[in-house]
Amino acid sequence: VKTHADPGEAAPRRGSRWVVDVAILTGALLVLVAATLAARWAWTPAPGPEEQVSCAPYGLEDVSTTPRGGARPLSTGPVLSGGLRWAEGTSDRLDVTFEHEGTTSSYHVFADGIDWSEPVGVVFRLHGDGAYEYEHPGHKVSCLAEVARSHNAVLVAPRTPDRQGEPTWWEDLDGNAEWFLALAEQRIFAEYDLDRSRTWLHGYSGGAEFISYELLADRADFLQGGGAVLSGGGGAPSTGTSEPTQEQLEQLVLHWDVGLEDDGTDPYAPFDALSAAAAGHAWYEDAGWARTSVRYREGVDHFELPEARVLDAAMTAGESPGERSAELSGEPSTEPPKRGRD
């Protein structure tokens, strides 16, 4: 019986068993990780096509578009300096802050897909009371931006600077107008190479009231071409200080669009947009605006207006002055509402 190792026999290495155990454990762990990843890859579907939003609720039955804003990070975009203007390569910019004389709010610019080698127009979209569409641009606003893009125009959607209760455009007409016009002049027209003869105002509900009571009535010189679309509102101002040129009176397109069911009897829409639109259209027509039109839509309430289709028709009319648009004044729903209607 050996009591010690032979001189020529290697002594056993201490810790060799531990090394073997660690190697076995590591191998098992690697196998487990590989199996887990393989299972995950096997059960994770490949990325599908980019989500699309249907524009059918806004009047464009066969049009779908990529949601703007809702499925992408917000960004203020590159910083401009030295008088540089946006040109090729510009894209959507969301929640950009703008301050004017102590009043601050924000705006979106939708510029994806614009051909900057051609003249570029602009649509200013003014939201209704509550600013819901500003906070959720992935639906209606995305479809309006697609309409604007189809006419090679950017869409600018500002949020009212109003912070008193429910955000509105019409409760502080002068203050909101000063901020809005400063935004247009100091940011939008200063930073983007735009054709001002293709400038459009597009307002819904309270945004339409802001256009008719203030922007057209007192600040019409802002519109050097294009026109205004007033959806679900746009009443008659008590007075008007604007002195439009003969060219403006003859060429600017002013269109009101309202549902015959939009008379304020719906508890969810207590504003009588029907009467407001009728009065606003009559006021501007009497004031000498030659290209006014109004469409009263049968069976339509405050929430069912085909706004994207109407914007497209109005912009097309602006590009083709000699053509009459059936969409803007087509039968059978062109008659004004009867007074005293229940």
Give the residues covered by each predicted segment.
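N-terminal Sec-pathway targeting helices
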Residues: 12-28
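Short substrate-entry loop that stabilizes the transition state in hydrolases
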Residues: 114-167
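Primarily recognizes the serine-hydrolase "nucleophile elbow" in alpha/beta-hydrolase
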Residues: 191, 197-249
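Alpha/beta-hydrolase-fold serine-hydrolase catalytic core, especially in secreted/extracellular enzymes
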Residues: 54-55, 287-291, 298-299, 306-309, ...
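Terminal targeting segments of Actinobacterial cell-envelope proteins
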Residues: 1-17
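A domain-start/cap signature at the N-terminus of enzymes
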Residues: 21-24, 35-121, 176, 280-282, ...
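The feature captures the conserved acid-bearing segment of alpha/beta-hydrolase catalytic domains
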Residues: 226-315
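Alpha/beta-hydrolase active-site loop
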Residues: 169-193
